[in-house]
Amino acid sequence: GELVEEGTLFVIDGEQHGYVEKSKKDSCYFAYSDGEPFFWIGINLCFPTAYEISSGSEFALSGNVAYLGLRQYESWMKKCAKHGVNIVRIWLGHEYWSPDTENTYELDSVKLSKIDKLVDLAKKHSLKLKLTVEQFRYFDHDKKSVFNKHLCHCGVPCESIRKWLSNEDYIEAWMYKIGELAKRYSGDTTVAMIELWNEMNAVGGEADLIMEWNKRILPRVKALFPHQLVTNSLGSLDSEGIAKFYKDFCWDDTDALQIHRYLDQGAPYKICGDNLIPSIKEAFSFMRTKERPMLLAETGAVNNCHSSEFKYYSADDRGIIFVDCVYTPLFVKSAGCGNIWHWDRRYVESKNLYKYFKPLRKLVDGVDFTSEAFEHLDLSTDKAHILLLRGRKTTLGFVRNKSDNWMKTLRDMREPEPIDVHIQTSGKGINIIPIWKYDTDAFTFLADGVTIKGLRYGFLFKYES
């Protein structure tokens, strides 16, 4: 062709690192397309708060609900970004976001526009998104519920999960929806992960069918979202039956292995009703893999058998459940922090716990998780949890007074007994990162480490080898 005009192209380095993917250097962690490490500091912000609408009479309700919606997300995302969060999870199947109508192949353009606006908000606050496509568990065309689905194909209602999972018409209709989402977001680096379903085993006793569906669908979704992480999730790992589902699941077809675990005194596994730190350690030990990143994708505390949010949340002004849930996974070689549930007025928002992301962010900033070849160590004593992540150049640590637990501090309303702790180091000066103010009587820095006198709660630390 004809040269119209000759010039010089200047390329300027920017802050865009590409997509979030499994690290090519260490498959236990995430990195951007350009190799820059990405340590996942996430939270569930799955759906907006529903506010019941007045009927116009004093104290009377209409039975309908309204949402602040995107305005509420603006507030949440602003707080998250300010305190160090870098990724949030959204349930696209919730009625506020879901583009589904009651007919297959008919999508709601208004709902798709809301998702577009959500992506714009995430960009504005430099946050990544994990999009969970579905969370429904049954079909009941006479009932309204967050876990219910109304869907027809060619005018005929779908009446069972079995039919939805096995019928080619419904499978292809669902893939059409995924294709429409892919047209909008598969080329967008803000979208880091596509999760097919929230706790898919909860749809009922269709284990073989669920496995078959996932083995077939996960590769097809990955083909539509080749640059995003693609995975799925299962319910809380708290019983032998669920544990078998976790072990048998086709994680080899995913880009990340996800665990859900809560403090739940009604769980068949008794460890789930005790202290969160050993419970989280046990879950990661059970599912340990070197093939792909692991995440504690849902965590927190619930009343027996997930009947409601934890009754002692109201007493947790210092966020001790938050800290133990969110911080612990890092020290068992998770690819990210624990992603807390109950993000809204049930816990995180009402107690203003966003600030506790900051110490964690300060700890991980500047650490190249993909190059350290980290190993996790447990040096706990009878009085303190002492968890280390030791790498080639950097060691990260988490110390918690064992008496500062939910049973003593929240239920019994007793102050923890102060303890003395010595942290031995083999490198340069130790950097103490406080979590709570007025936590200790004194830090004494010695040639071989640091001695802490009168530790009430806990702290983070790191040092260079």
Where are these regions (language model features)?
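Aromatic- and carboxylate-lined catalytic core of secreted/periplasmic carbohydrate-active enzymes
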Residues: 293-294, 302-304, 318-444, 453-464
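Short, electropositive alpha-helical surface patch
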Residues: 142-155, 312-317, 354-358
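Active-site mouth of glycoside hydrolases
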Residues: 14-19, 23-268, 278, 289-290
